[in-house]
């Protein structure tokens, strides 16, 4: 058996372990959410997290509670107040769902437009062309011909009745076209050029600054991007929030306005960013909450719809009530969050090479760029899109730092391997790799090591007991006899 097969098996076990951890975490997220819904104002998040951590392991499984929780998170029917929403049938361009504030925002007659004698009424079945000027209606209809409609965002439209301009932000959902409408403020310069180009121009200076950085320092990279986002958006606090292997989070870099309590270096439990929310960040990479105290707006759907309209891709989607309470408790009234999505590291290159080419670049959520503000704050779509560009460039450079770290690590390993090999050649006994300087612990990052040779055990630092090492050796020869080596995060999971 080739050496790649055991490595591939180890890689597969690691993936299975990761999937099991995510499932267990999702179950815990669901239990905490259920406790929040039931307890209301008496909900004590810290106490419950500690109880879960110190208590028995979470029972895994797709229970009804977990499924209901995921549906509740991903299929909410509320939006925020900074815009309105329409869902359109792609064939007829008729409205099949609308937010309760849409009629007022899109059809209110303005005295500045006196020629409107019979203003359109907005409801289920209304043809969206009747709501906007010919140019805007044509631009919206043009989106139907694009496989990726987001490439056109934002589309500038004008209401027939009021003449007011709106950014139309379009995406496809199951069975329909969902359009977010955000008013263009009088102080804004409307995005008349291609949306992506306009947004890139806004982020160009920050992107140039990041691209000019020398490699080799993740801290410098994070500090730079945090400073650029702070200058670009004007929020009170900006953080680079990094996820660790066990899914807990750390504030890795931070900049604040004067007088704010620093969060830098703080670690938060995995439940702080639920798995369902992480999934949504992989789908919709920029998330803005303008005012956590504002009342959410209901979305009304046609009664005869054969499918459920998902708002997962909507920029207007209202946050979960638990998160709103969490924000208010932190005195963070508004937030803007960008997902940092990087290539998933495969620990074994040979195992990776056995996979089809299209599967080699799996993605994962490295962390988040998080902006907090102590008062309501709205960031227009072109600037949000610029922040998304910036986060993408940042992610590319995070990947580069991973590669540099990997190359340096491999270089040091080869150097140490050569030194230890020379020591073994010079000495008649392998004891030199545990008794000498350097020793085997300098080759592999670890808390302890052990050598079993001639029936005797030599232990270094935080290693298992002698009897446990004998048990592990017997297990390896029995279960993994054909393996040239074994690497695992859990001996239990490895069999």
Curated annotation (Swiss-Prot):
Bilayer-spanning residue ranges: none
Protein origin, superkingdom: Eukaryota
Family: Belongs to the phytochrome family.
Record note on quaternary structure: Homodimer.
Protein's UniProt keywords contain Protease: no
GO terms of molecular function: photoreceptor activity
Residue stretches of biased makeup (Low complexity): 1-21
Pfam families referenced in this protein's UniProt entry, alphabetically: GAF, PAS_2, PHY
Record InterPro entries: GAF, GAF-like_dom_sf, PAS-like_dom_sf, PAS_2, Phyto_chromo_attachment, Phyto_chromo_BS, Phytochrome, Phytochrome_cen-reg
Domain GAF: 217-402
Binding site for phytochromobilin: 322
Official protein name in the record: Phytochrome A type 5
Any GO BP: regulation of DNA-templated transcription
Segments of this protein annotated with the region Disordered: 1-24
Protein modification: Contains one covalently linked phytochromobilin chromophore.
Originating species: Avena sativa
